Amino acid sequence: TAVLTQTDYLLVYPIGTEAGALPVKYWLTDTNAKNLSIHIQPTSSVRVRAMITGSGATTSPFGVALYCRKDADSYTKAVDSFGANVFRLYGAGATPDIPSSLTPTSNRLCSASCVVGAMLRDQSSSFTVQALTIGQSIELDTVIYIIASPGVTVNCRYQKDDGTALNVYTNTATMIIDEPAAGGMGF
């Protein structure tokens, strides 16, 4: 039986090239910053990068999307508007410092048997993960915008586009909303 596992994640600043944007914990290397939760301001943008690995048997191709939740709520697909959520996709607007949707991903988390993934910024840019053979991995990178009150926790993970969860989540991205920084500058 084919098994899909989200094995690792990396939370990255939204600004910068696909491969060159710094981890939010910028003083750490990608390897040391992976799978670490972060504390962010009540209004923040962040890139959620994750690696999905196939095992057991060759997987079938599937559409993929980022799903997030506030605190213990159910996971909801991140779309271009907030609706009732505290998160949304960044959007497709012209932002020269953030790669556009479907920009191919490099290998920041994957060290072997990697297939090319994609950057996702808006809901109109769908991406289909090709069939993964046993041991193959893919990296996906999605830019989200969060507006939430201090004390809120936002978790994000990749699921199939139709809402079906992957088989296993070894690590799930976690962002904890803090009080605004002194001086109101966000630093």
Give short role names for the model-derived ranges.
Residues 9-13, 48, 66, 140-142, ...:
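Generic structural hydrophobic/aromatic packing signal, biased to beta-strands
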Residues 36-93:
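Low-complexity, serine/threonine/proline/glycine-rich extracellular segments that form mucin-like
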Residues 1-41, 122-123, 127, 176-187:
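Short, compositionally biased P/S/T/A/G/V-rich stretches that sit at domain boundaries
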Residues 14, 18, 61, 81, ...:
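Intrinsically disordered, low-complexity segments enriched in small/polar residues
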Residues 69-74, 82, 105-112, 157-169:
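Enriched for extracellular/lumenal, surface-exposed ectodomains of secreted and cell-surface proteins
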Residues 32-37, 90-139:
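Extracellular adhesion/glycan-binding regions together with long Ser/Thr-
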